[in-house]
Amino acid sequence: MSKEKIIGIDLGTTNSVVSVMEGGDPVVIQNSEGARTTPSIVAFTAKGETLIGQFAKNQAITNAVNTIRSAKRFIGRRLNECESEMKHVSYKVIRSGNEGVKFETSAGEFTPQEISARVLMKMKQTAEDYLGQKVTKAVITVPAYFNDEQRQATKDAGRIAGLEVERIINEPTAAALAYGFDKKNVNSKIAVYDLGGGTFDISILELADGVFEVKSTNGDTHLGGDDFDMAIMEWMISEFKNQTGIDISADKNTVQRLKEAAEKAKIELSGTMSTQINLPFITADASGPKHLDMTLTRAKFDQLTKSLVDRTRIPCENALRDAGLKASDINEVILVGGSIRIPAVQELVKQVFGKEPNKSVNPDEVVAIGAAIQGGVLAGEVSDVLLLDVTPLSLGIETLGGVMTKLIERNTTIPTKKSQVFSTAADNQSAVSIHVLQGEREMASANRTLGRFDLIGIPPAPRGVPQIEVTFDIDANGIVHVSAKDLGTGKEQKIRIESSSGLSEDEIQKMVKDAEAHAAADKAQREVIEAKNELDTLTYSLEKTVNEAGDKIGANEKQLATDEIKRAREAIESNDKARIESAKASISKIATDIASKVYSQSAPGAEQAAAGGPNGGAGSNDQGNSTNNGEKVVDADYTVVDDEKK
């Protein structure tokens, strides 16, 4: 029996493609209908049948409420994050569990993972028919800006389809792999501009001697060909209402007809200057049947979709900046996805990068080909290719004052692992709560919560003494694992991040944009919080020193310290940075004077108390928080657990 193949699948919003390595080269496999692409559509008929692909698409107009398309736009998202999609689909979208999404049909309720699994099953069967053997392993592509939940949901869809997902790889990276597969001796910098049916990605890569290294990635998880179709649909609905006074947007079957007509018009306008949209018997009123007959010019189409095209510009500029490159440094721009055929899109690419885009690859098939090549690498069929991908957004945890402390920066090569030592923020704290975040903002509340977990059973100790090592581990699929370990006791808690949903429309891109727009305000707020934390630590240490000093210091010195501690606490409450800095200077001087006096009067063996003076206290991000090996200790957010109530 021949060695089991690892197939490559491009699970697209609009269409899906399957490919496999044969004789050292990738081959795109035709489906049972003789097509190399399969519509990512699933339908449930009145007879109890499940139709997938072209057969499902063919009956969509007459069975709109039971025909699910663009499921990828819902996968890994909360219901309230899908409001714009829900307005433009012909099927019913309902709540699943706490916050998830399901599709309601006559055959039952289905999650986006289940619908995607049906499409993957079609791809799996297509490969098995071609290879003449069972297929159980696959590499599946996802948009580069898919978050952890969406990647896991895609893996779940594969598992439902009976596939062991050997690797999740980013679509632009897969495209670069396909483009450079036969150019291993060429050293070049390329940009992959990927505008698909539901998502947009831009990745900057460097190709050198068979190594494909992603330098940066950016994008918009809710921008694609569907949005161009919707723009045409909304124009048709508005024009028809102006002409007849009838709103045709409420009927699901009519919406499906409009969707197909809009998609057809969009495609035609890539090759012609105008197109005729003719939908007879679109509706009726008391005077009889009504027909929709309109002419859409390319100029009007460009006007309707200009804002959509422009939304791809800033991600391109950000990706270049993050890669440390200028547009002139890019040797080739590769176009991927069906929507890149739109002339206005190609013109924007030319403007941004200053060169004609490379059109040598098939934009519909190149991603699946790259997935097959990666499958060949994992199966041992391809040995001279190395793929180095990145994580698109920064990861970290919330620390004292509501600050996000980043452990892994965006565009870090994966797989990767990073640890940092944190400490407690209160005396005798027996538990810490780890709040895992994703995003670029300085404050935790402005970033995306990926999950929370607790590490309990920490032995009683003064704040700052326990050492809690938090470790982030991102695997080659871009999926996040987090652990927290008490270095004193060895107790450890591990989780794989499993949030209830994915990100909202434009949310990941919005994180980066908001970070840039609010950079100054975020920085100022963070500086105030860090100054407050430092002053709090100094105050705590001084108070402890005074209490332990006893009669080693005089009454006047004690009163001076007490007054300064009161003034420091008032400064902490004020949020006035200048006042906080002034209090820090004053309390540092007093603390140093008292510590010196106590030290000079101490008996041998008492130095440790003095050493715990102004800079020895725990809880600050920047002062006196070092482990024996020099690792930085940062204050962690915490939850106090009452042992008597357990």
Curated annotation (Swiss-Prot):
This is Chaperone protein DnaK. It holds the Pfam family HSP70. Residues 598-646 are annotated as: Disordered. Induction: By stress conditions e.g. heat shock. Keywords: ATP-binding, Chaperone, Nucleotide-binding, Phosphoprotein, Stress response. Residues 601-612 have a biased composition (Low complexity). Belongs to the heat shock protein 70 family. The keyword Chaperone applies. InterPro entries: ATPase_NBD (IPR043129), Chaperone_DnaK (IPR012725), Heat_shock_70_CS (IPR018181), HSP70_C_sf (IPR029048), HSP70_peptide-bd_sf (IPR029047), Hsp_70_fam (IPR013126). Acts as a chaperone. GO terms for molecular function: ATP binding; ATP-dependent protein folding chaperone; unfolded protein binding. It comes from the Bacteria. The lineage of its organism: Bacteria, Pseudomonadati, Spirochaetota, Spirochaetia, Leptospirales.
